[in-house]
Amino acid sequence: MATELRRKLVIVGDGACGKTCLLIVFSKGTFPEVYVPTVFENYVADVEVDGRHVELALWDTAGQEDYDRLRPLSYPDSHVILICFAVDSPDSLDNVQEKWISEVLHFCSSLPILLVACKADLRNDPKIIEELSKTNQHPVTTEEGQAVAQKIGAYKYLECSAKTNEGVREVFESATRAAMLKHKPKVKPSSGTKKKKRCILL
């Protein structure tokens, strides 16, 4: 029997953007109706992709600023990062670029990143649309999410709704596939300098 693969996934994003609900629906199959801010939680889920069985450790994190110094403890030995935002919160997508991508690249520069839109079921919710219109905002569109994913160099962009379970499995199957890739550190060559080539002796 093939050795079971183990991979570690860390999920980050603004507080209340839907990270914990996404993990609970995937790992336990139930949607938590009461919001309890996360401090630090771990879940384990078995995922089968492309005929391979993977034990996926899911590390939930707190998005609130109070935990900015604690959160980096989650990153070591990770294989893939999910950066989440909420479709009903354009500000949470702004923070992907303003805060989350720089933090993730600082601690996990060589890992694949998936950008995940949570609460996709609220995109056409009349109450949400009305509420956001008061501040000249609108629910995040798929195109806006894809544009940010491209800008931050995400491995993939996905949308899901933990409440309806739509797209949830796809998020973690894609993340597991990404976690199984062989990663090379992303090196940004500074302007005016040439990349150093490594010599291989045969």
From Swiss-Prot:
A lipid is attached at C199 (S-geranylgeranyl cysteine). One of its GO terms (molecular function) is GDP binding. Belongs to the small GTPase superfamily. Rho family. This is GTP-binding protein rho1. GO terms for biological process: actin filament organization; positive regulation of (1->3)-beta-D-glucan biosynthetic process; positive regulation of cell integrity MAPK cascade; positive regulation of mitotic division septum assembly; positive regulation of primary cell septum biogenesis; positive regulation of regulation of ascospore wall (1->3)-beta-D-glucan biosynthetic process; regulation of actin cytoskeleton organization; regulation of cell wall (1->3)-beta-D-glucan biosynthetic process. Keywords: Cell membrane, GTP-binding, Lipoprotein, Membrane, Methylation, Nucleotide-binding, Prenylation. It is found in: Cell membrane. The modification Cysteine methyl ester is found at C199. The keyword Membrane applies. The lineage of its organism: Eukaryota, Fungi, Dikarya, Ascomycota, Taphrinomycotina. SUPFAM superfamilies: P-loop containing nucleoside triphosphate hydrolases (SSF52540). It comes from Schizosaccharomyces pombe (strain 972 / ATCC 24843). The gene is rho1. It is a lipid-anchor. A motif (Effector region) lies at residues 35-43. Its main location: membrane. Involved in the regulation of cell wall growth and actin cytoskeleton organization. Activates (1,3)-beta-D-glucan synthase. One of its GO terms (cellular component) is plasma membrane. It comes from the Eukaryota. It holds the Pfam family Ras.
